[in-house]
Regions:
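N-terminal hydrophobic/helix-forming segments and targeting peptides
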Residues: 1-302
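Single conserved hydrophobic/aromatic residue that forms the stacking wall/gate
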Residues: 303-317
């Protein structure tokens, strides 16, 4: 049953992809393994027929492409996104203390259902920017263990809990990190060998530590956190790597910030894709008219999570 192997591969991919930065790192590793060359937006590109390349922006979006062996006259594009509904730590003011506990000061990120986040083992992953000699560098970080939780009130303190509750992120859902001293050694959880004053900024996201599973009488179902939209990122990458460019440039784009409108410099509504295609066009010796003609003949597919049927409430399908 080959589909079970693919399903497990997807679940393993999701468990490694704990933030948009980790998604792009995983995508880059997979592309490197398949003979792709990383390019830089700030440098001149030298492309060859049959070449395979990729470029990243903000370390959270990636565009990979294959140049056909012969001349091309269009682009074939598949797109998905690297971010997921979650909670993001407020980097400028990350802690809330009340004399007993240290909580993380978080904001809701994307279109989430809030209730499943309660009473689960959660952790943090993302990126920190640190001093590096006379400059700075970014470092991927992951606590890698059960670190925080968002506890529900017990039923005897909230008798209406089964009658429908409206949760406020700011008052009901700040994750407990530890006792009142926890903030003093927070950064050591991620970069134990880096002085606190050398950590200049951070972008940290909560993630669910519960592993996904394959279930059902015939193992026909799959459940996991971050399916939106990592199942699409995984599927588009696998399909892209299996395809061969013939007569068109094959493009696989995974954008960040779809969950919050795509308007950032690395979002789908940014210049990233357009400028990448213009780079390809120029490096292949084609003029502006040829670029617009090729673009007009492009084929684009956007992958995202959707609903075919609603198993819990069939009447709403």
């Amino acid at each position: 049953m080959e589909y079970l192997n693919t399903a497990q591969e997807l679940l393993d991919f999701i468990m490694r992809c704990k933030s948009p930065f980790h998604v792009v790192k995983e995508a880059g590793d997979l592309l490197n393994e398949n003979g792709y060359t990383k390019l830089e937006e700030t440098k001149e590109w030298s492309l060859v027929p049959g070449g395979k390349y990729y470029v990243t922006r903000n370390e959270s979006s990636v565009i990979a492409f294959q140049i056909p062996e012969s001349a091309f006259s269009s682009y074939q594009i598949i797109a998905s996104h690297s971010d997921c509904p979650t909670f993001k730590v407020k980097g400028e003011d990350p802690f809330v203390t009340d004399g007993h506990y240290t909580r993380l000061n978080v904001e809701g990120y994307g279109g989430m259902i809030r209730s499943p986040w309660f009473d689960r083992p959660l952790s943090l992953a993302g990126r920190m920017v640190v001093r590096d000699g006379n400059g700075v560098k970014s470092v991927l970080v992951d606590a890698g263990r059960d670190l925080v939780t968002i506890p529900n009130l017990p039923i005897h303190l909230n008798r209406d809990i089964n009658n429908g509750i409206k949760y406020s992120v700011q008052t009901d859902m700040l994750p407990i990190l530890g006792d009142e001293t926890a903030k003093d050694h927070f950064y050591e959880l991620f970069l134990p060998d880096t002085a606190k004053e050398d950590i200049l900024s951070m972008e940290l996201y909560l993630y669910n530590r519960v592993e996904g599973s394959i279930w059902g009488a015939s193992k026909e179902f799959l459940s996991s956190g971050r399916l939106d939209d990592l199942q699409s990122a995984f599927g588009s990458l696998k399909g892209f790597l299996a395809a061969k460019a013939t007569g068109q440039v094959n493009v696989c784009a995974i954008f960040d910030n779809e969950e919050v409108g795509s308007l950032t410099k690395q979002g789908a509504d940014s210049s990233f894709l357009t400028e990448t295609l213009q780079h390809i066009n120029a490096a292949c010796g084609k003029d502006t008219i040829a670029y617009h003609r090729d673009l007009a003949d492009r084929k684009s597919t956007r992958l995202n999570s959707s609903h075919l049927a609603r198993s819990r409430m069939p009447s709403s399908a």
